[in-house]
Structure formats: structure tokens, C-alpha cells
């Protein structure tokens, strides 16, 4: 079944794109409600695969959350980026995914810059890769800065 993208009329122009292949996220609003600077009131956009149940699509429509389809069973990043550009006017994104989403983008070859922050914090969490199932991509150091006890490194694709 070919499913149609859903783009409501009342879009904000400030977006948070969620890659949700199976349609599992239960949003309470169509905007991000977060006290962290830079995220509050961002319009949520769901990127889905065609395997998502019609009931979830009805839920997103009732919440006026835009969604686009990008792949049958797995997210096709290039389709997603093209649709975000043509349907929403989004030309570049800040990727803040976990290792799975980061891996989608890395394997698609669409990451042109990596910004890493090293902070002196010890966490009690299991080790997780930055990119799941990645290919070998090479980047070169563009810039490095120290902010108090934190180091920021900016890399660009070779």
C-alpha cells in the first residue's frame, strides 16, 4: 500500500525531526516541550517507514504532527532529506541521534561535519558506539577549542 505524506498547514518553520521507523513514539503535543535552550516549541516532524500502522497515522493527524514516508521497512535517509527539503524547506539539519540514527546517516554518506564535545563526566552506562554498523568514513580536524574543562572538536569530511 502506498501511503501519503501528511503536512498540515500550520507549520512553525522551526523543526525537530524524529526518525521513527515503526511509529512507536507517543507525542503529547505537536511541538517539543523542553526547558533546554534551543528546543522548546520546535514543530515535530515524524519520518516513518511504510510499515507503520494506519492507527498511528490517524493519531499523528489528530495531533497535527506532520509525517513523511522514507522507505518501506528501513529509513532511506536520502529520500527523507529530499522530502524534508522539498516539502518543508529544510536544507540542512543538526543530527543529534543515537548510534542507530547516526549510522543511517553515515552509511548514506550525507554527514559532512562532526562536532564532538569531550567533558570530564563519568557515566554508569554501557558503552555505545557513536555510529551503529558504520562504514569507514574519513574526516579531518577543522577546529578545536577549550571551554573551561570541556573540549570541542569540529571535523569535516575529507
PLM regions with names:
Residues 1-158:
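Enzymes that bind and transform nitrogen-containing heteroaromatic metabolites
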